[in-house]
Amino acid sequence: MQKGKLLFFTSDYKIGQSSLLTDQLMALHKSEQEFVAVSGENEQEAGLKERIADIGIDVRRIEGLDVHANFMGLARQIADIVRQEDVRCVHVQNNWQILLVVFVKFILLRRFGLKIIYTLHGFRNNSPLKSVIARVIIGMVLLLFANRVICMSTYLKRKFYFLGKKAVLIPLGISDEYFLPEHPQLPDKGLQMVFPAQFRHGKNQDIIIRAFAKHIQKCNDAESHLYLPGKGELQDEMVRLTHELGIADRVSFPGFCTKQEVLQLYLKCNIGVIASNSETFGQCIVEPFVLGRCVVSTHVGIADDILVDGENGYFYNSEDELVSVFDKLYHNQILIGKAGNMNFNKKQMFAWDNVTERYVGLILKLWR
């Protein structure tokens, strides 16, 4: 039984209404939980506002919400919504939002029974020093003010072990268009691999490129191809690396891709390969998993929660280990299909309806 109304933030810093949170909002709309959605005036990609308007979701737009300025003005607007809608629980997505809500709760409204849920999306996790500092600062804020903290993977929950019972494990969902009724056919010639990610430090596309070059030379592989969609400060450096290694014709750089374009790349491939130092969740892990692709990954994000090495995926800890994985799968391509089939059969754990059921259950427990 629902006990009150939820205020759900659907936008993030410098992004506006995000694609991910739009999917979550649409799933929440199908549940019995009553909510009010709030967002900044911008959107991550064109069409997100129309998607939710088409199904009758009204989002309160607060100008400047996703810019770190005008704190008092934003807090007053949020306080008005909480008061007018009799909100009993607020779900925030970043540190700026939780500070605004804490100010509303304790200073503007003095509504001490207002519950706060926080989703951990990131914490400078590709920089060791910044990661430690961020965990300490964020952790202190969450210990003091959050009632529950959603961690999207066991990997992330361990990073914030000191939150104790406040931390709950609920994964993210994946967009409905990734849930195909039948297992899409896997390419059967060579390793067709994809890693969608920003080109920045910590994503390590260079490790994949070098390992791929070594594999091609070692196995005389004339069939395989690597796709690296995304953009960022290191993209030109990665392109140069492929030329230096003589594999420029075997690696494609499609640039920024929409969700639908990334989906089409996955369907051209039989392997999702991940090289990140760290992921809080790892959509780049889950998307190929849901589509029934083999997943090759470092031990980050949700990978250890869903992959068993040598069965439905493969782990590696170094460039040389990645070369060995490439060689093994190239010479035993039946293993790619076996892993893909296992993953496709487990895909429903990431359907938004199933994730939302757990999420609404969390809210109900807060009101008991």
Summary of predicted features, one role per range:
Residues 7-9, 186-203, 209-212:
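Conserved donor-binding/catalytic core segment of Leloir-type glycosyltransferases
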Residues 309-310, 314-320, 328-333:
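Conserved acidic donor-binding segment of nucleotide-sugar-dependent glycosyltransferases
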Residues 294-297:
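Short hydrophobic beta-strand element within catalytic cores of glycosyltransferases
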Residues 256-257, 264-269:
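Short alpha-helical donor nucleotide-sugar binding micro-motif in glycosyltransferases
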Residues 155, 173:
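Carbohydrate-associated surface elements
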Residues 8-23, 27-70, 159:
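N-terminal strand-loop element at the rim of the active site
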Residues 277:
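Aromatic "clamp/platform" in nucleotide-sugar-dependent glycosyltransferases that forms part
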Residues 92-98, 120:
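Short His-centered aromatic/hydrophobic patch
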